[in-house]
Amino acid sequence: TLYNMEEYIVSARKYRPMTFDSVVGQKALTTTLKNAVKSGKLAHAYLFCGPRGVGKTTCARIFAKAINCMNPTQDGEACGECESCKAFAEQRSYNIFELDAASNNSVEHIKSLMEQTRIPPQVGKYKVFIIDEVHMLSSAAFNAFLKTLEEPPAHVIFILATTEKHKILPTILSRCQIYDFERMTVENTISHLKNVAQKEGITY
């Protein structure tokens, strides 16, 4: 049977992990992030590095949600029930901002994002800014971003993601906690596909 592209995309969204424990193949890393949520010891900037499709953006979203959760679990996961978690799930969160630098890499894009950093969050403790493919920012945009990164407001956390760590300026690297994501193993991929197949009632 031929499936159209829409169905593939819907499946990818349907099975995108929503908790740290459902992320495949990054156990050590997700444990460290959960511990940061539990202890409340959060850095102002994180850099998630690794090849495409290993869960960098997914983990950034889960982490952002957990940081702003009003009742995180004892394990450091977001509760999924509080107003902050619900707002995030319904894509109406005023505390979590995402920028895809692959298509929004001009100095204007970064400046408008940096304007948002000045305003404290209405609900919750932090404003979290996820910048995907951060290596794609223009040099002028990098410099505009660096000004805020050097002296971030107390209520701001940046989560940057990149597939090309070597293209990130050393001045930015030195201000981030760096997390290197593992490549997916064949075993992890097979076990995840079996899990999805079972849920979809597909025999294999």
Q: What does each model-identified segment do?
A:
Residues 1-178, 184-198:
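P-loop/Walker A NTP-binding region and its immediately flanking N-terminal helices
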